[in-house]
Amino acid sequence: MKDLLKFLKQQSKTEEFNGIKIGLASPDLIRSWSFGEVKKPETINYRTFKPEREGLFCARIFGPVKDYECLCGKYKRLKHRGVICEKCGVEVTQTKVRRERMGHIDLASPVAHIWFLKSLPSRIGLMLDMTLRDIERVLYFESFVVIEPGMTSLERGQMLTEESYLDALEEYGDEFEAKMGAEAVLELLRAIELEKEIESLREELPSINSETRRKKMTKRLKLIEAFFHSGNKPEWMILKVLPVLPPDLRPLVPLDGGRFATSDLNDLYRRVINRNNRLKRLLDLAAPDIIVRNEKRMLQESVDALLDNGRRGRAITGSNKRPLKSLADMIKGKQGRFRQNLLGKRVDYSGRSVITVGPTLRLHQCGLPKKMALELFKPFIYGKLEGRGLATTIKAAKKMVEREVPEVWDVLDDVIREHPVMLNRAPTLHRLGIQAFEPVLIEGKAIQLHPLVCAAYNADFDGDQMAVHVPLTLEAQLEARSLMMSTNNILSPANGEPVITPSQDVVLGLYYASRKCVNGKGEGMVFESIDEVEKAYRTGFAAIHAQVKVRITETHIAENGERTEARRIVDTTVGRSLLSRVLPKGLSFDLVNQNMGKKQIGKLLNTCYRQLGLKDTVVFADQLMYAGFHYATVSGASVGIDDMVIPAAKYTLVADAEAEVLEIQEQFQSGLVTAGERYNKVIDIWASANEKISKAMMDNLSVETVINRDGEEEEQESFNSIYMMADSGARGSAAQIRQLAGMRGLMAKPDGSIIETPIVANFREGLNVSQYFISTHGARKGLADTALKTANSGYLTRRLVDVAQDLVVIEDDCGTFEGLTMKPLIEGGDVVEPLRERVLGRVVALDVFYPGTEKVLAPRNTLLDEAWCDTLEDNSIDEVIVRSVISCNTDFGVCKACYGRDLARGHIINQGEAIGVVAAQSIGEPGTQLNGWRTFHIGGAASRASAENNVQVKNAGTVKLHNAKHVTNSEGKLVIVSRSSEVAIIDELGREKERYKVPYGTILEKLEESIVTAGEIIANWDPHTHPIISEVAGTIKFVDMIEGVTMTRQTDDLTGLSSIVVMEVGQRPTAGKEMRPSIRLLDASGEDLKIPGTEVPAQYFLPGKAIVNQDDNAEINVGDALARIPQESSKTRDITGGLPRVADLFEARKPKEPAILAEYSGTISFGKETKGKRRLLITPADGGKPYEEMIPKWRNLNVFEGEKVERGEVIADGAEAAHDILRLRGIHKVANYIVNEVQDVYRLQGVKINDKHIEVIIRQMLRKCLITDAGDSQFLAGEQAEVARVKIANRELEAQGKKPATFDRELLGITKASLATESFISAASFQETTRVLTEAAVGGKSDKLRGLKENVIVGRLIPAGTGYAYHQKRNAALAAKASGKTSEQATTITASEAERNLADLLNLAGSSD
């Protein structure tokens, strides 16, 4: 009966709420929660262990200490339930009420709540429009504040020191009222009339000009409105009554030896009660003011410490010098309530153990130790034993299991059959870190794991442990089987490729089996079937590598599923024909008729999955694995010291390098090269020596000479074990073999600089002491980096999950026509990512036409699968507009069409899929593989960048220019006169093959649309200077060019040529400060020439340091350089790479020296210069007001006076800031920028992540906007709001014919975006808990529980996956209820009524016994 009651209570609790509201508690509300006032600081009586009356653990207030038993023992047993004992005043009920009953303390003097005071921005300060310092001075009794000025010259809220207060008293008597302490603040807050205040602020706002004041007013207005709408009263921020936490939540536990362990809260409460009681006594005694004040201040401090210890002043410490844990500390941080207990719970029916290999398991199985299974499945076993009649009671069943009688094992087998268990390995970085398997009982104590799932778990068998969880309910078992079974998780959610590819031993075995060798036993034999081959191999007539001819039978599966068989004879080897036995029907023999390296096996599995589906692939993967292990064993491949063959050429190469180094050293000593050059040269010499040695070594290792059938020598690929391991991709790489048999090479110091003497020895020769010592540097740095990297990567993942957790697919199609334009990614001469990889699995947003026609090739809303991608490639389409989550119109979610294919399943995504979390995991999981700090070991990268001075094409094709302005010079070549121009090479099908950026002043050797051949150089430029190109031909006229004032003449000693150098403003004499040196171009009659197509005279202004090679009155042609500006570039900017770069992008951090972009389209001119800055003016083409910007002088400008720029063009080079791109070029450009930049980092490490995942995060970064004009909406101009909210409001306004609000999208970093979510529960559990909760409470916010995190925290199914349907049903029911409220009312019965009825029944039952 009791359980039934519990059940009823529970039911009513979980179902009845749809949101959680947080607000301020009024004193009356606190009293209404309370079951009595706590008056004494005592806890329990140390002799009797009974709680003291009216103390912190009082049984009268909080409830009985033992179930159904009052304190004095007069009433015991269930039948007295609900009686209040007249002797001790304790209600007879369950002890559990001590966990929920609260008490209260009536404070003798009001106290400010520290959260609303000190949590910035201070809410009390904002409300009273006073500074925090002033309020603190009032609260802590340092000065008075005027409350009622009366008929005096004082103002309300004015601060008075002790002296000035006394003066005022003398002057005005009791005309006015001034107080100090929290009472004063309370009165000030009480005096605020919210409605009037709102009206006056709204009237005042438009007339304020100062930006800072307007911001402050808007903040204050928002706060007061929040108070007004939420029904909170400002004076509730001051506490008059302090609630007391139920005692079982701050327990006092007796330890052995008569001591007690207590929660810190008890100490904190004790201090408050002590001080409060002392203050009451002092007030009764009418003690002197100064004593009372001191006591009030101490009370305020003790309440501060209870609520949030350490926020103000020094933290109160306990006996052991550590700060006490206050209420705020209980909920925040990793160990706080949110993250420790609500988001991460420990679960029952779980166990953990070490893992070992289970090479004989099938893919869906795992080996579970019998001991563990017995413990995990106990309840099921008890049930079965009873059901079969082997045990009469549960107790008997328990005994049987403890004795481990034989029948128990039979029952266990029965229980386990078809009952999946879940295996998890920490850290669970992505969803493949938990998978379900069918258990197979094994002896021993270690869990056996299938080798193929190791990659997904990132598990190895060097002592890793794993946890087992048992899904109990039928639904849970069903979900585990259909969604989490390892066989259903073959593809990786990050990139859609198989994640169960074989590695290591399996690869080595398959590679060994598929190799061929010359003159193997049985070479040249012909077999009529694969059975015959096997017979010959087994009887020893043919060796596994022998080259033979075999007749094979292949099955072809047509589009419609028809199967046809075909036979043919192939040249192959014995091993390959044996491997083809495990090949499923429908795959071509050619897939195994090659050396099976890791790449080939991966491709084989992928092909199998795409052509034959899931089931066949799973079976095939298992068979491949068994075969691989078998042949690896047979091969006898091992690592021996003689396998590391040192090339003979090594010693001569090392000697040569040493000689070269000596030569450089001599040059340096005779002063021919600088120290830096010497260092770089030496490092280059050793690097190239290392390359040569390793090439010699690999050439040596990779082939061996054998005698063929005809008795002649022949070279064949080597069977050296080490070479085979590296070549197959099983383990090791050329770089590692180089260290074994070549030379170790150059080593880096811990700070990253390269030590110039390399280690010439290798591991086979062994290192000497100094070499070994140098080696240890790198090793230790590697370990330290890894540890830091793991922490950083984990934190990035956490932020990503938090920002994206509430993004779920919630509708089929939002109907948008927008999308992202996808083109192949081309960098220089390489296609980095072809179009098919970018659009595979996406939905077309706008019809794709056959090139050059109006005929539709792929209609809108087509999901592009592999077949469609082939079609696009065949028709050489190189641009498709696809749907993207960034442009999806769904509010609070996305639609299926904008997301496209679910990568882990290979079909279009389902509703309810939690794409946000999947995206965050996919980006965060490879984080540990990214390198910690900066990429690119400077050396290779730096030297290449400096030499870029031409474009050499790799493929033949046609030249095409992108956004390039150009003029033709006297030689008939094109000269580029625009920024950010690109030249591309197009093949005969119109597909772009290469694309290069070319700077201003590039001379093109080829005209547009001309044909080039591979290897031709098509563009040249000077990388070290920035030319100023003349766009007209004419005569040069110098303006403001005065020798010694604005310029100097310099003559080159070697060549004898003189040139003019413009002086920098700072170095000019006073006369030259205001002058603007420039070159004008005149025509033959001495008139100003105009720049073609405009009315602007051709006048070129020269910045400081410009070198002019022409003289006054010289003739000049179009496209010639008037002057050159030396570039102080190629200061190798440290390229941030790896994790920090990804984090910077997602946090949308501003780079140190951002590129300056043009805010408007128009014409450039320069205004008056200040000390360190230039004034840049942009005059719009329509003649509007010029926009001006101050730019530091040291920035290299890309533009000249009179040049036209488009909005968003780069004016000064630098790293582009994402915010600027969004503001000036729009949402699609910023999305492309972030996606490409993030992908660059991952691509460098060879990690594949689908663009979709990054787009999902970007959508979350863009979900806020800034209201520019409120229209008729309830928003304020300048307010930050959720885009979806604004859109919904605008739709309503438009429907009513009112003016909608206008807004600008805003890009927030992921941390900011997480904290700015609508759900305060989610934000509070992420970071800055105090600030989030304070803000939410003041605004009386209500959490609609829309995201996943909030629902986990309140203990519900999440609104995604299988919980999605449950939430949809609930919402439908709620909607129905809202529309048809009245009808149902009569029949329902509330839980409390049911409880009363049950109580009566129980009492009847109780009294009858």
From Swiss-Prot:
InterPro entries on file: DNA-dir_RpoC_beta_prime, DNA-dir_RpoC_beta_prime_bact, RNA_pol_asu, RNA_pol_N, RNA_pol_Rpb1_1, RNA_pol_Rpb1_3, RNA_pol_Rpb1_3_sf, RNA_pol_Rpb1_4
Swiss-Prot/TrEMBL keywords: DNA-directed RNA polymerase, Magnesium, Metal-binding, Nucleotidyltransferase, Transcription, Transferase, Zinc
Gene3D superfamilies noted in UniProt: 1.10.132.30, 1.10.150.390, 1.10.1790.20, 1.10.40.90, 2.40.40.20, 2.40.50.100, RNA polymerase II, clamp domain, RNA polymerase Rpb1, domain 3
Listed GO MF terms: DNA binding; DNA-directed RNA polymerase activity; magnesium ion binding; zinc ion binding
GO cellular component: DNA-directed RNA polymerase complex
Parts of the chain that traverse the membrane: none
Keyword check for Aminoacyl-tRNA synthetase: no
UniProt catalytic activity: RNA(n) + a ribonucleoside 5'-triphosphate = RNA(n+1) + diphosphate
Binding site for Zn(2+) 1: 70, 72, 85, 88
Residues noted as binding Zn(2+) 2 in the record, renumbered to the chain: 814, 888, 895, 898
SUPFAM superfamilies: beta and beta-prime subunits of DNA dependent RNA-polymerase
Protein family (similarity comment): Belongs to the RNA polymerase beta' chain family.
General function of this protein: DNA-dependent RNA polymerase catalyzes the transcription of DNA into RNA using the four ribonucleoside triphosphates as substrates.
Name the UniProt record assigns to this protein: DNA-directed RNA polymerase subunit beta'
Provenance organism: Shewanella violacea
